[in-house]
């Protein structure tokens, strides 16, 4: 199973990678992108089953990225993460069937 991590902070991406128990989750490949535009391209190319992404990023938000990906990867599992508690982002994440918002 492929995991795509999309976050504009490299430290966050590397921290997540080092803390995720890949074997227990069945993850065989980790992909990374530094914003929504690059995340969209990586997702289209590699078709990850799980997408873990930040909500607020430069160039394209995680919400906008996953709205566009819904057409191409309707079965992917989105998980949003954010340091913000904005209710509008949370509502948008729920609409996109995010399994979690952390």
Model-derived regions: residue spans:
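Conserved acidic segment of CheY-like receiver
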Residues: 1-12, 16-17, 51
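Conserved Asp/Asn-Gly motif in the active-site loop of CheY-like receiver
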Residues: 30-37
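Short helix-capping segments at alpha-helix termini
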Residues: 22-26, 72-74
């Amino acid at each position: 199973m492929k995991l795509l991590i999309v976050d504009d902070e490299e430290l966050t991406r590397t921290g997540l990678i080092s803390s995720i128990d890949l074997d227990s989750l069945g993850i065989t490949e980790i992909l990374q992108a530094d914003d929504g535009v690059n995340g969209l391209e990586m997702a289209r190319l590699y078709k990850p089953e799980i997408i873990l992404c930040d909500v607020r990023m430069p160039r394209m938000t995680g919400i906008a990225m996953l709205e566009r990906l819904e057409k191409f990867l309707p079965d992917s599992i989105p998980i949003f993460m954010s340091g913000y508690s904005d209710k509008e982002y949370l509502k948008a994440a729920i609409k996109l069937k995010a399994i979690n918002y952390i």
